[in-house]
Amino acid sequence: SSSFISHEQAWINLNRELPDSKDFDDIKSEGRKAWNNELSKIKVESEDSDYGISNKIKFYSCFYRTLLFPRQFHEYDKNGRQIHYSPYNGKILDGPLYTDNGFWDTFRAVFPFYSILYPEKLGEIMQGIMVNPYLESGWLPEWSSPGHRDCMIGSNSASIIAEAYIKGIRNFDINIAYKGILNNSENEGPLSSVGRKGVKDYNKLGYIPFDSSVNENVARTLEYAYNDYSIWKLAEELNRPQKELDVFKKRAEYYKNVFDPE
């Protein structure tokens, strides 16, 4: 057994997950049952051919891998209360924490998939992968692994939060999440893994110029514009001031600035 919290917590985890009353076959059976329960939530019909069977195998293999992440980082104490070691500030804190996810890779399809199949669970994930990291570090993550890791461009945390809330998912603190979104949209972070690189040029010019010190200029401009579109739609849902709506509505069209009309 293992724990990020303490030796005592590792024993709690072990006794909860592998009590003496269960043997190897019991655990194997429970694992098979748990996975079949999840994978049976979608039924795929295929033609009875090598091609059809191959596609069916491919679908369920991808479904299985989709459910592996984000990873649950929190643990349950002896009273069943959620607690976690924070990779953001080194403290032991209450509540959920999820990690091991890069949003540039997952905002397009994975999180929309969760919102359809696991709406209630997604709310807890939002609290654990967006809200709590912001409270513990002052920044929304873009790739948590398990803390802030530098790789992903854009601020797609905003896109994921906006989609979840607009689709009716409410069991997370949207007000804290929105504060994090606004902070990301206006600032470069103290680490290159958070905030927006080139944000001053982007907000002033409507794009990140090629001769700036920031790489991936066009890609970042496109990502930021989509992120700002998402913020605009979320701000509408939250009844934010019109002046604020106008800012993000304008920025949402900055993608046009990197297209050559010829």
Indicate residue ranges for each PLM-predicted region.
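Alpha-helical support elements that line or immediately flank enzyme active sites
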Residues: 61-75, 99-101, 105-122, 162-168, ...
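Second-shell loop/turn segments in exported
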Residues: 15-24, 40-50, 97-99, 110-115, ...
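Active-site cavity-forming subdomains of large catalytic enzyme subunits
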Residues: 121-129, 133-259
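Acidic/polar, glycine-enriched structural segments that form the non-catalytic walls/loops
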Residues: 1-97, 141, 170-171, 175, ...
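Short helix-capping and inter-helix turn/linker motifs at the boundaries of alpha-helical repeat units
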Residues: 53, 88, 100-103, 151-152, ...
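Long, His/Glu/Asp-enriched segments that create or flank divalent metal/ion-associated functional microenvironments
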Residues: 262
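Flexible loop/turn segments at secondary-structure boundaries
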Residues: 5-8, 69-73, 83, 110-111, ...
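A conserved hydrophobic secondary-structure block that centers on an alpha-helix together
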Residues: 45-52, 93-100, 106-112, 116-140, ...
